[in-house]
């Protein structure tokens, strides 16, 4: 019998990696119904889909993860078979080794097979995060595509291609109902909307022009979000000698538009993302604290403070009185 794991073993040194490397022995018998998806922060973020088949895990690397709807196919690169023990593997593969980087289980569960040939695989996944009918089909060599055959999950909305930022009204006086606003610094930086999907970033300025290449350092933020899709509003600000993306609003979160949600709720979801990295952070906000925030802005030489009504929706492209800019 051919050793299905020969290629797998040849690529790994048991003295250097904690990955399971079983001896060449008879393969365990299973029911060909186990799947696992592992998020793999290697040189390039991707998700490894592994399907139990004939005692091994037949594997594909999917750079953008599973497609959420039938309208989009994603690349799936057929890789070497992995041992069944790999279904439980999580950890750090040493840099310099094959697949070096952090890996963890994104989802696992059962699957049923509708069709399995050398060029096409139709399956139904039943996991905690991944469910539905998918087909994998070969296009050329190791390159396959994965297509979702079922409709998207109820309530899912596609990520927009762009969002033109909402703009504040400049005022000299503090609003009488200042306690109904969340107050934050106006940084005087470059306004930028970040669209993140499948660990990939598209960055646009206030006019909608793409500026991703000019700010490639921010791609690490997109990778830090993993499979979560999001649209963020913020500013690129020079802090500590380097540009930093300061996130101040969340407009779309993992298949759901938040434009109609009140700012207070959007803000809570933004904080839930815990965006904090070497070149990105969440802008602090202080509900009702306008005078203290304005005084601090003046002391730090910032141009002003921005107030957002806690009950206000996000109005793309509009100059709205629901947002107030007060000069320092």
Labelled PLM ranges:
Residues 1-328:
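Catalytic cores of nucleic-acid ligases and guanylyltransferases
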């Amino acid at each position: 019998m051919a050793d299905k794991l020969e290629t797998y073993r040849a690529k790994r040194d048991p003295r250097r990696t904690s990955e399971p490397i079983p001896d060449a022995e008879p393969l365990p018998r299973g029911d060909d119904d186990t799947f696992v998806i592992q998020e793999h922060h290697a040189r390039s973020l991707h998700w490894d889909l592994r399907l139990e088949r004939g005692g091994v895990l037949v594997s594909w690397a999917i750079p953008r993860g599973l497609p959420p709807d039938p309208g989009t196919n994603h690349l799936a690169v057929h890789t070497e078979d992995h041992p069944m023990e790999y279904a439980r593997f999580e950890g750090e593969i040493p840099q310099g080794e094959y697949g070096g980087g952090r890996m963890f289980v994104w989802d696992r569960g059962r699957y049923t097979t509708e069709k399995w040939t050398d060029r096409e695989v139709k399956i139904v996944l039943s996991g905690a995060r991944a469910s539905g009918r998918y087909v994998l089909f070969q296009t050329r060599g190791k390159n396959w595509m994965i297509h979702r055959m079922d409709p998207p999950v109820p309530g899912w909305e596609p990520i927009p291609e762009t969002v033109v930022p909402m703009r504040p009204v400049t005022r000299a006086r503090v609003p009488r109902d200042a306690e109904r606003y969340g107050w934050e610094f106006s940084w005087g930086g470059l306004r930028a909307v970040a669209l993140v999907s499948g660990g990939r970033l598209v960055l646009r300025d206030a006019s909608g022009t793409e500026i991703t290449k000019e700010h490639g350092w921010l791609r690490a933020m997109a990778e830090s979000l993993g499979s979560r899709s999001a649209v963020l509003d913020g500013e690129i600000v020079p802090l500590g000698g380097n540009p930093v993306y300061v996130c101040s609003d969340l407009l779309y979160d993992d298949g759901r538009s938040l434009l109609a949600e009140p700012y207070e709720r959007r803000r809570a979801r933004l904080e839930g993302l815990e965006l904090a990295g070497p070149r990105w952070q969440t802008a602090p906000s202080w509900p009702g604290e306008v005078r203290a925030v304005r005084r601090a802005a003046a002391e730090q030489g910032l141009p002003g403070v921005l107030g957002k009504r806690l009950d206000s929706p996000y109005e793309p492209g509009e100059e709205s009185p629901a947002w107030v800019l007060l000069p320092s």
